[in-house]
């Protein structure tokens, strides 16, 4: 089985890549990126660096043959230069690449969305995330796993990629992480946990609903269960 990771230089995408490369079910894990990986990878990982993301769909080939697509591909309004430009990355590029992967036989997609995502939201960010979810579901993959994390924690390689809530929320999130106050801040979660849970769910789809929505609390609970099994 081969996997494909988009957004592998980010918190969640990096988590996808690290945990997918450790899973024996994957023979190869491809990553399409604009820059080199910021962390070491095993020989199982094939990193394809192409700065022009308009060419990315052409890189998803029959030879790659990804059975699972993990996408944490996203930017921020500040990094993109406005919501319209952010939409072209977060929504349009994600959909284009998901469609390309499906045409090459991909059956499972794992999408990082956001807590509060809804296509009818009054808030631009939540509306965009909801529209991504809606349109990914419409592509009709065999298995669709939508992760909805709250504030993301972890060390970022790009200061502009502050994501949900920005640096202040992340700082507060670290303080309440897995505490009795975590609900007040939307269950902050580490990007690596999001990646770990996404890989686990992608490899365990038997008997599950075609479309799975996984909340931030669910991610924390599943991650904790996996840690107990590992020890």
From Swiss-Prot:
Q: Which domain of life is it from?
A: Eukaryota
One Pfam entry name: HIM1
Give a GO cellular-component term. mitochondrion
* Location in or out of the cell: Mitochondrion outer membrane
Which SUPFAM superfamilies would you find in this protein's record? Answer: NAD(P)-binding Rossmann-fold domains
Q: Name one GO biological process term.
A: import into nucleus
Q: How does it sit in the membrane?
A: Peripheral membrane protein
Name the Gene3D superfamilies for this protein. Answer: NAD(P)-binding Rossmann-like Domain
Q: What is the extent of the transit peptide? A: 1-44
Per its UniProt record, what InterPro entries does this chain match?
A: Him1/Fmp52 (IPR014843), NAD(P)-bd_dom_sf (IPR036291)
Keyword field: Membrane, Mitochondrion, Mitochondrion outer membrane, Transit peptide
What family does the database annotate?
A: Belongs to the FMP52 family.
Name the PANTHER family on file: OXIDOREDUCTASE HTATIP2
Q: Which additional comment does the entry carry?
A: Present with 1340 molecules/cell in log phase SD medium.
Please report the name of this protein according to its UniProt entry. Answer: Protein FMP52, mitochondrial
- Gene field: FMP52
